[in-house]
């Protein structure tokens, strides 16, 4: 068996992570019906998936993925600027732009790649105006911070969802050189709370700032026709980034905005230029999801209603769920050991709700990140509420 020269360091780092109760391990899952997961020989009700609308197992997505793969092949064969720009890519982009109400859209390989590569390209375009002023929410996803760090720009961080603080920071630097960017999310993945997008857009307009909005966890679930919260802002936002891997049940990501913006990214975004294009099967699933999602208002309403009911139950049990107002409901228990124990209690009762610990969330805020799905019915929600109450009692008694 081969060993690397650094295995001793890797092993030591893993041991330290285990001592802090933050070591992670992969668990093998197999296919199960929507809203469920087969894990270690058991079928569990799945409250950890980002498949918010239950589309990952929808027959139309599977059928169109298979059809497009059969007709067009298993792969795109190259990056889009070489010879991988299929008519299918442009078809999906045009459909997405129509639904988003933007001039154009551009497909990318993943949400992480989009944020990590698009942000540096934007900052490069503005370099002639001086060092860009980049205002970021303190709880932004790691990929947004990574994109800023990759560009070598200084982040001016505002308190989470605190638009008064953001406006104060912008006013402090009024007249300073450099293009202004506000980078934030519409729905925050670990807390399930929302940004006030119309107010953000108005604030950005007042301060002549470019608004970059990550809609990964809103796409499919929130906003007009399920197309995200950018649609609530008159005139939209400068750039909306979103994914197809969560509410839309497939894979990949997009940016939507002006034609000039998307054409510029084709020429300047490394993550677009140097990556093999999305394959036909993935494009087929995306295309099918885009046909379905605008018609799922009833499913979205039921999903958000489940969130309201769960939050009320957690509050009655004395479990903090922060400012959640979406399908993502954190059960914040603080201690990493308590979060692991509560997750184990739920799994013993047939439910999967994974514990989230530092560094994914700040120290002292370990939690179960409960992700609801339209595939869950009232019976599954009842089961979750009962298991949380019993499990939390058991954890506190054992502490």
From Swiss-Prot:
Disulfide pattern: none
Keywords recorded for this protein, A-Z: Biotin biosynthesis, Pyridoxal phosphate, Transferase
Residue positions where N6-(pyridoxal phosphate)lysine is found in the record: 246
Function statement: Catalyzes the decarboxylative condensation of pimeloyl-[acyl-carrier protein] and L-alanine to produce 8-amino-7-oxononanoate (AON), [acyl-carrier protein], and carbon dioxide.
Gene responsible for this protein: bioF
Family as reported in the entry's similarity comment: Belongs to the class-II pyridoxal-phosphate-dependent aminotransferase family. BioF subfamily.
Record InterPro entries: Aminotrans_II_pyridoxalP_BS (IPR001917), Aminotransferase_I/II_large (IPR004839), AON_synthase_class-II (IPR050087), AONS_Archaea/Proteobacteria (IPR004723), PyrdxlP-dep_Trfase (IPR015424), PyrdxlP-dep_Trfase_major (IPR015421), PyrdxlP-dep_Trfase_small (IPR015422)
Enzyme Commission number, as recorded: 2.3.1.47
UniProt pathway: Cofactor biosynthesis; biotin biosynthesis
Residues noted as binding substrate in the record, renumbered to the chain: 24, 141, 360
Catalytic activity: 6-carboxyhexanoyl-[ACP] + L-alanine + H(+) = (8S)-8-amino-7-oxononanoate + holo-[ACP] + CO2
Protein name in UniProt: Putative 8-amino-7-oxononanoate synthase
Reported cofactor(s): pyridoxal 5'-phosphate
Signal peptide stretch: none
GO molecular function annotation: 8-amino-7-oxononanoate synthase activity; pyridoxal phosphate binding
Native species: Bordetella bronchiseptica (strain ATCC BAA-588 / NCTC 13252 / RB50)
GO biological process terms, semicolon-separated: biotin biosynthetic process
Subunit structure: Homodimer.
Amino acids binding pyridoxal 5'-phosphate: 111-112, 189, 214-217, 243-246
């Amino acid at each position: 068996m081969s060993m690397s020269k650094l295995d001793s360091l890797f092993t030591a780092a893993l041991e330290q992570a285990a001592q802090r109760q933050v070591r992670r391990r992969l668990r093998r899952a197999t296919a199960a019906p929507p809203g469920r997961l087969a894990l270690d020989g058991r079928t569990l009700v799945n409250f950890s998936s980002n498949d918010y609308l239950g589309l990952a197992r929808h027959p139309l997505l599977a059928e169109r993925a298979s059809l497009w793969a059969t007709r067009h092949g298993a792969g795109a064969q190259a990056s889009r600027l070489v010879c991988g720009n299929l008519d299918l890519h442009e078809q999906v982009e045009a459909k997405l732009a129509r639904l988003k109400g933007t001039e154009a859209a551009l497909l990318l390989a993943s949400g992480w790649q989009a944020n990590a590569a698009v942000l540096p390209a934007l900052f490069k375009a503005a370099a002639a105006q001086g060092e860009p002023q980049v205002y970021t929410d303190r709880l932004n996803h790691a990929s947004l911070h990574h994109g800023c760090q990759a560009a070598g720009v200084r982040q001016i961080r505002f308190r989470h969802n605190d638009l008064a603080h953001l406006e104060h920071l912008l006013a402090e630097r009024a007249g300073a050189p450099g293009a202004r960017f506000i980078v934030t999310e519409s729905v925050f993945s670990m807390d399930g709370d929302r940004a006030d997008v119309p107010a953000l857009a108005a604030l950005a307009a007042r301060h002549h700032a470019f608004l970059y909005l990550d809609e990964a966890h809103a796409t499919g679930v929130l906003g007009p026709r399920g197309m995200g919260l950018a649609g609530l802002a008159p005139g939209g936002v400068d750039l909306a980034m979103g994914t197809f891997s969560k509410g839309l049940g497939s894979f990949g990501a997009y940016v939507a905005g002006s034609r000039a913006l998307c054409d510029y990214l084709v020429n300047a975004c490394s993550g677009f230029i140097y990556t093999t294009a999305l394959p036909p099967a993935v494009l087929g699933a995306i295309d099918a999801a885009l046909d379905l999602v605008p018609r799922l208002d009833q499913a979205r309403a039921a999903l958000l209603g489940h969130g309201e009911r769960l939050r009320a139950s957690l509050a009655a049990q004395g479990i903090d769920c922060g400012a959640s107002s979406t399908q993502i409901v954190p059960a914040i228990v603080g201690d990493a050991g308590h979060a692991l124990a509560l997750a184990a209690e739920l799994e013993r009762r047939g439910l999967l709700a994974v514990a989230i610990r530092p560094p994914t969330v700040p120290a002292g805020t370990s939690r179960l990140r409960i992700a609801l799905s339209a595939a869950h019915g009232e019976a599954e929600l009842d089961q979750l509420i009962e298991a949380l109450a019993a499990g939390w009692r058991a954890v506190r008694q054992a502490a």
